[in-house]
UniProtKB/Swiss-Prot annotation:
Pfam families recorded: UPAR_LY6
Chief location bin: secreted
Superkingdom of the source species: Eukaryota
Localization of this protein: Secreted
Entry's Gene Ontology cellular component terms: extracellular region
Disulfide bonds: 26-53, 29-38, 45-71, 75-91, 92-98
Lineage per the UniProt record: Eukaryota, Metazoa, Chordata, Craniata, Vertebrata
Keyword vocabulary terms for this entry: Disulfide bond, Glycoprotein, Secreted, Signal
Domain UPAR/Ly6: 24-101
Provenance organism: Sus scrofa
Protein name: Protein PIP-1
InterPro entries on file: LY6_UPA_recep-like
UniProt xrefs under CDD domains: TFP_LU_ECD_SP10_like
Length: 101
């Protein structure tokens, strides 16, 4: 049984050493409430290719209003500012479910 587990583990280690991207599980939700509860479209996604997990939070003043989580190919961390509204967009690829609200 130990030999059966050794081959998949060896393949994972070799692929990470050679730079092949590993699929990453991310939280996915179309609308996360200010308290962190998914209100619409709760599921998980798995990154493919150069995708990363993302988390977008929308603030009104200094208070979180709502958010959005998922997988994205276009993932550039940034902040947008408008009068009384801030949108914070963050990306991660360091660990599974790194886009927790």
């Amino acid at each position: 049984m130990g030999k059966c587990l050794l081959l998949p583990l060896l393949l994972v280690v070799l692929s990470s050493l050679l730079g092949f991207p590993q699929a990453l599980e991310c939280f996915q939700c179309q609308r996360v409430s200010a308290s962190g509860v998914c209100e619409s479209g709760k599921s998980f996604c798995q990154t493919q290719g150069s995708q990363q997990c993302f988390l977008r939070k929308v603030y009104e003043g200094d208070t979180v209003s709502y958010g959005h989580q998922g997988c994205s190919s276009l993932c550039v961390p940034m902040k947008f500012f408008r009068p009384n509204v801030t949108v914070d967009f963050r990306c991660c690829h360091d660990s599974p479910f790194c886009n927790k609200f």
